[in-house]
Structures are given as structure tokens and as C-alpha cells.
Design a protein with these regions (language model features):
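Cytosolic regulatory regions of ion transport systems
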Residues: 1-118
């Protein structure tokens, strides 16, 4: 499966390690070139420096050919916007890490109308 992970913090790094071990084709997107370099030195994956909310960055990451986008930054809004942009760009599946109870209350709308899993 071709997967784009937005965010290379603790969650994104752990997710990349697990999915890489399972044999998935990964592309990581993060603002930190240092974090991306650390992961590309350890894992077989592609890295793109930039914001996951940027349509151009997602295109560079190969969103048009990806199966799944998982956004796991520390910011709920960035995760939701990254997933929404990816869904509109390619129709791929999208999962956003969301911690704010406000968004959890809107889960049905976000899932059914925006097509984003949380």
C-alpha cells in the first residue's frame, strides 16, 4: 500500500517504523528536514520537506497515486486540512489524528461529509 504520513514527531516516526516493517511504500511530509533525514537514514522511504496542508507539497509527495494519507502532527487543524486537501486532490483514504473533544463531537459530519476518519 502507498501511504503518505504527515508529521514526523513521536507518533509519525513510530507509525513510519511499523508501516515500513510491514512492507508499505511510505512517503513522509514534515517541516523539519532534520527529522526527515534521520528517518530516511534508518528506513526505506521517501521524504518531502514542507507543510502537509500545501497542495503542491502533497503533489510532490505523490498524493495523486497514494492509497492513504495519515496526518499525525500535534495540531488538529493541520491534520484535518492535510487530509481534506489530500481527499480533494486524489480521492484517497485519509486518517487525521485529532485530540480536541470539539472535533470528536463532530465526528459524524467529518467522516460522512468530508470523508476523513479520525
Amino acid at each position: 500500500m502507498r501511504i503518505i504520513i504527515v508529521g514526523c514527531g513521536k507518533v509519525g516516526s513510530a507509525l513510519a517504523e511499523q508501516l515500513s516493517a510491514e512492507g508499505h511504500e511510505l512517503t513522509l511530509v514534515d517541516l523539519s528536514e532534520r527529522r526527515l533525514e534521520e528517518l530516511t537514514n534508518r528506513l526505506d522511504l521517501t521524504a518531502v520537506a514542507g507543510s502537509g496542508t500545501s497542495y503542491q507539497v502533497l503533489l510532490e509527495a505523490g498524493v495523486q497515486d497514494t492509497d492513504l494519507v495519515i496526518a499525525v502532527t500535534t495540531h488538529d487543524e493541520i491534520n484535518l486540512l492535510s487530509c481534506l486537501t489530500a481527499r480533494k486532490a486524489s480521492g484517497c483514504h485519509a486518517i487525521a489524528r485529532v485530540r480536541d473533544p470539539q472535533y470528536v463531537a463532530d465526528l459524524g459530519f467529518i467522516r460522512d461529509e468530508l470523508g476523513i476518519s479520525m
